[in-house]
Amino acid sequence: MAFANLRKVLISDSLDPCCRKILQDGGLQVVEKQNLSKEELIAELQDCEGLIVRSATKVTADVINAAEKLQVVGRAGTGVDNVDLEAATRKGVLVMNTPNGNSLSAAELTCGMIMCLARQIPQATASMKDGKWERKKFMGTELNGKTLGILGLGRIGREVATRMQSFGMKTIGYDPIISPEVSASFGVQQLPLEEIWPLCDFITVHTPLLPSTTGLLNDNTFAQCKKGVRVVNCARGGIVDEGALLRALQSGQCAGAALDVFTEEPPRDRALVDHENVISCPHLGASTKEAQSRCGEEIAVQFVDMVKGKSLAGVVNAQALTSAFSPHTKPWIGLAEALGTLMRAWAGSPKGTIQVITQGTSLKNAGNCLSPAVIVGLLKEASKQADVNLVNAKLLVKEAGLDVTTSHSPAAPGEQGFGECLLAVALAGAPYQAVGLVQGTTPVLQGLNGAVFRPEVPLRRGLPLLLFRTQTSDPAMLPTMIGLLAEAGVRLLSYQTSLVSDGETWHVMGISSLLPSLEAWKPHVTEAFQFHF
């Protein structure tokens, strides 16, 4: 998937000026317009291939579907709650974020919230501003020796852990992805959730908002907590059930809460914000000069590197694409698309299971990034719903009635005895298998159904190929075929044959354009098909 034609980017939220400068220095045109309505945003995007947002702009399905040229949405921040990922993926629009940009700022705010909860600093400040001197009212608690439960041990969670350990806190946590060995390396003991609740003096959440994390803290879990537990949410509104939190505060089960995020922002229901034991901020987790600059810089660099084909970072909805930008993998992506296109032309809109098989040490983990490219080749001529690319390929292939499996073989798929890296694409249960490899940076076809080409056939983008199989070696065959090409006004550009396999030979002709029909070829060959990619 190439982004070289991405030329113009709209920045629709406030970002550090370095973002615009980096984009322009990278050769991109930049338009900055903020506070756009949905209709205004759609209008601006009619001439833009890229969009960069922070939190304010809502990139809905309506916006994505109406923006015909849109290729990439960049979120200068961690979450992508304001981008409709399903709609973007279906349309083949890449979504990126800056997962590292605001981690430190969010972690520091969390630590500040924990300290404010322990010593009631905001409440004491408000009291002083009212002219009061209430030393007894604001009795606090030390952090030393207390247990902090951290739910979500990614970048932010681990930064919080190391900082609060310096206050003498014991850190325990839970993360379904991070291994206990990894979390132990930064001082967090992982426990099951049901064991965490009764141990914690403080709980802080650092998970994405998913169906599995919505309402993670609820009436049931609050009931399992220590009486007087304190809760911090600087992650996403909705992870803590706001109704359950209010009830826990009112009953004293929860001694205090610090909230930077809400289910609705700004919150119209003020019951939580107005509670005397709640500290709240208007979503300030990433609101530092450093984070703003870092996020703006990172997303701009990601755009420029992507357009120049250097690298692809921060991908949210097509992680396999990241591998597609490595110098080693790029030509294999081209080969995979070519073999997918060949398979569709050969098998005629195949149904069932397509097998993608890799061989060779350097391709051991490449199946997940090569299979979308195979799908692009299979579907790009057939899909009536959308343009097929590496972003939406896996979604659209299911709707086309195809399953795609990937596997790695220590031995060559098809013809045995070759030690190089190979890629094979086959239709399960049917006599269709194509094998290719990369020579230098050129994808080449090595074999069809066990018939091996020596030398291999170059697969060049834009060069039509005509492939046909014959049973006998008739000296008059080649002049006859050239005559058929001439009758159709098509020139022969190259010609190669396979080694004889089971008494038959495959022939490959590079031709100046695809033939309007292969009917005239059928009396002379066992089978024939043509394609270009």
Swiss-Prot record:
Residues holding NAD(+): T78, R155, I156, D175, T207, C234, A235, R236, D260, H283, L284, G285, A286
Reaction(s) catalysed (UniProt annotation): (2R)-3-phosphoglycerate + NAD(+) = 3-phosphooxypyruvate + NADH + H(+); (R)-2-hydroxyglutarate + NAD(+) = 2-oxoglutarate + NADH + H(+); (S)-malate + NAD(+) = oxaloacetate + NADH + H(+)
Cross-link (Glycyl lysine isopeptide (Lys-Gly) (interchain with G-Cter in SUMO2)): K21
Cross-linked sites for Glycyl lysine isopeptide (Lys-Gly) (interchain with G-Cter in SUMO1): K21
Disulphide linkage map: none
UniProt record similarity statement: Belongs to the D-isomer specific 2-hydroxyacid dehydrogenase family.
Oligomer status and interactors: Homotetramer.
Name assigned to this protein: D-3-phosphoglycerate dehydrogenase
Organism from which the protein derives: Macaca fascicularis (Crab-eating macaque)
